[in-house]
Swiss-Prot record:
Any one of the GO BP annotations: mismatch repair
Annotated protein name in UniProt: Ribonuclease HIII
Gene that this sequence comes from: rnhC
Family as reported in the entry's similarity comment: Belongs to the RNase HII family. RnhC subfamily.
Annotated catalysed reactions: Endonucleolytic cleavage to 5'-phosphomonoester
Protein task: Endonuclease that specifically degrades the RNA of RNA-DNA hybrids.
CDD domains, sorted: RNase_HII_bacteria_HIII_like, RNAse_HIII_N
GO MF assignments: magnesium ion binding; RNA binding; RNA-DNA hybrid ribonuclease activity
Lineage: Bacteria, Bacillati, Bacillota, Bacilli, Lactobacillales
Length: 296
């Protein structure tokens, strides 16, 4: 929970009141004359002329009314042209595996921040569906989607890949294609899902290679705008694929790998047989066995 306090003129507060009128809430504070709540951020205007913004990300709303964040020291490479790569779908039973690599330069930062691109994990799916097309249009990127059918052909015992090596292959290919398109980064960062040593081990099996060094960094999505952009575009690609598969089978396929996925998988088995899971799900997940057990 963060708090931002602004000293505002009567005119500025009047503008704030008008803008947030539809979000107004009641306040019992004797020193406050206006309060509102917008997307989880509480706003209170005091008779002293001070206005507080309190919530998980108060700076987003406060910036609309004159707040300017103190410059923070950026992570190494943040102020460089940076390729960031991330994947979505690897933890979901249903749906494909989406990997996106994006090139972000310092000139893009203001645009990205105006959209609220920080860490896509703080954005709901509705917001992601709204933002992703804007990012796809403006930010150079390469997006790959491995469908469940293709995933099941290449991932598993005795097949070309395991669940980790297939991600190495997709990240490598997305970055390779972006570099081939003319992207000239100062740094390449992947949201870490494996050690550097093992990444390089799996990389030896790939056909396409590039000389530019990569950095595997944990929680990179929250540190680098390029990785956050890739995460948002990848999430949207994954959701669109999940929608398409749901329409094809006539059942709403959930994201994730919990009990709901077991239930839907059992219904698909009952309605269409094993082939339905081969074309909509990552078959090697434990959910497949649990779905069969539900039919006994």
């Amino acid at each position: 929970m963060g708090t931002i306090v602004l000293k505002m003129t009567a005119e500025q507060i009047s503008v704030l009141q008008k803008d947030l009128a539809s979000y107004a809430t009641a306040t019992k504070n004797p020193y406050a004359f206006f309060s509102a709540k917008v997307d989880g951020t509480s706003v209170i205007a005091y008779t002293s002329g001070k206005v507080t913004f309190q919530g998980a990300k108060p700076e987003i709303l406060a910036s609309r009314f004159g707040y300017q964040a103190e410059p923070k020291q950026s992570p190494d490479g943040q102020n460089l042209a940076l390729i960031g790569s991330d994947e979505v779908g690897n933890g979901s039973y249903f749906g494909g595996l989406a990997v996106v690599a994006s090139l972000v330069t310092p000139a893009d930062h203001a645009f990205l921040k105006s959209l609220g691109v920080d860490d896509s994990k703080n954005l709901n799916d509705s917001k992601i569906r709204q933002i992703a097309p804007l990012l796809e249009e403006k930010i150079p990127h390469k997006a790959l989607l491995l469908s469940p059918r293709k995933y099941n052909e290449v991932v598993g015992d005795g097949k070309a890949h395991n669940a980790v090596s297939v991600k190495v292959a997709l990240h490598n290919q997305a970055i390779f294609l972006l570099l081939q398109s003319g992207a000239k980064p100062d740094k390449i960062v992947i949201d870490a899902f494996i050690s550097e040593k093992n990444y390089q081990k799996y990389l030896k099996n790939e056909r396409n290679h590039f000389e530019f060094p990569i950095t595997l960094e944990e929680k990179a999505e929250g540190k680098y705008l390029a990785v956050a952009v890739s995460s948002i575009i990848a999430r949207n690609l994954f959701l669109k694929n999940l929608d398409k598969l749901s329409q094809e089978v006539g059942y709403t396929l959930p994201s994730g790998a919990g009990a709901k996925s077991d239930q839907v998988a059992a219904k698909l088995l009952q309605a269409y047989g094993d082939q339905a899971l081969q074309t909509t799900a990552k078959y090697h997940f434990a959910n497949t066995k649990k779905a069969y057990q539900r039919l006994k």
